[in-house]
A protein has these predicted regions:
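Divalent-cation-assisted or electrostatically stabilized phosphate/pyrophosphate-binding catalytic cores
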Residues: 40, 44-47
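Glycine-rich N-terminal loop/short-helix segment of MobA-like nucleotidyltransferase
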Residues: 36-37
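Ribokinase/PfkB-type carbohydrate-kinase core domain
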Residues: 1-33, 48-55, 60-201
């Protein structure tokens, strides 16, 4: 037990820069007692609704819960969901370095749950295009935050943040700064992560 306490206490000394796709998770809870007369689908009576960080935002929440000093870089839309993501990140006591892109909708995953049954998931999302101007602003954040980090974590959820040159450019900066970079990848093509210190299998 003392060893575990020592390990957990050590987390508070680690400064982690997490970079990844953030999203908002919504859970709609209710009960089903009948089938719709309009179509053979259940009618759910809504009881309550909860919101939380999803994607790489959930990773950040877990790191902060362990006591890690965490800075988080991602892209959100100039919308209510993006502002809600920022508030949730601030509540975890991480440092949110969010790049806001006008015209982009922050990704939201909506899950409908009745009792123990997950009835449906609805996604509100659009592809994130890391065009040159956005990529430049994003990499400026990376350059500004990198010197203070002990470790860099790339959390790829396949929403466009690491498409194109983004992942190689970030990894090159980490290597130049001699910062270890760990990748939690998405998909089967790992070539974009070449040069990373390690990756989750």
């Amino acid at each position: 037990m003392n060893r575990l306490h020592t390990l957990i206490d050590g987390f508070s000394r680690v400064r982690i820069l997490c970079i990844g796709d953030v999203m908002l998770d919504k859970f709609l809870y209710g009960s089903v007692s009948r089938i719709s007369p309009e179509a053979p689908v259940p009618i759910m009576k809504m009881d309550r609704e909860t919101h939380m960080l999803g994607g790489a935002g959930n990773v950040v929440s877990n790191l902060c819960a362990l006591g890690c000093r965490t800075t988080f870089i991602s892209v959100v839309g100039d919308d209510d969901h993006g502002r809600q993501v920022r508030r949730f990140l601030e509540e975890t006591h991480c440092v949110p370095e969010l790049v806001v892109r006008e015209g982009y909708e922050t990704t939201v995953k909506i899950r409908f749950v009745a009792g123990k049954h997950h009835l449906l998931r609805a996604d509100q999302e659009q592809p994130l295009n890391m065009e040159p101007e956005l990529a430049s602003r994003f990499l400026e954040r990376v350059d500004a935050c990198l010197p203070e980090a002990d470790l860099v974590l790339l959390s790829d959820y396949g929403k466009g943040l690491f498409d194109g040159r983004t992942a190689p450019d970030v990894i090159a900066r980490c290597r130049a700064a001699r910062k270890p970079v760990i990748v939690d990848p998405k998909g089967a093509d790992y070539s974009r992560y070449r040069g990373a210190t390690d990756r989750k299998s």
